[in-house]
């Protein structure tokens, strides 16, 4: 920061958290609109392109953020929230699927729920094993 008499001149900020947030909201809206159009028109490849472009744009913008975006507490809260989400989804979806299968209601949906639970648990085990042997940053 450079002070000239009573006027303070600051270096222009390349990108702050607020700017990242605004671009993130705009990107989410654009991706949502593109996905809506793709579903309506039946063109699945538009969805893939829109999501990949949105992820790439957010990645580029986040690299330019100079401020601290998260601290240790934020990371720990995210870890706990993620773990509870997986636990609650797995238990709820497994029970819902089992009840639906037992009552012979919407068999395809029940099997999809059970399959989703299996996939989530397999992914959890893969990541747990990966991070068990890898040094945590």
Curated annotation (Swiss-Prot):
Bilayer topology term: Multi-pass membrane protein
This protein's GO CC annotations: plasma membrane
InterPro entries, per the entry: DUF2178_TM
Keywords: Cell membrane, Membrane, Transmembrane, Transmembrane helix
Bilayer-crossing regions: 20-39, 44-61, 86-105, 109-131
Localization per Swiss-Prot or TrEMBL: Cell membrane
Name of the protein in question: Uncharacterized protein AF_1792
Naturally occurring in which organism (per UniProt): Archaeoglobus fulgidus (strain ATCC 49558 / DSM 4304 / JCM 9628 / NBRC 100126 / VC-16)
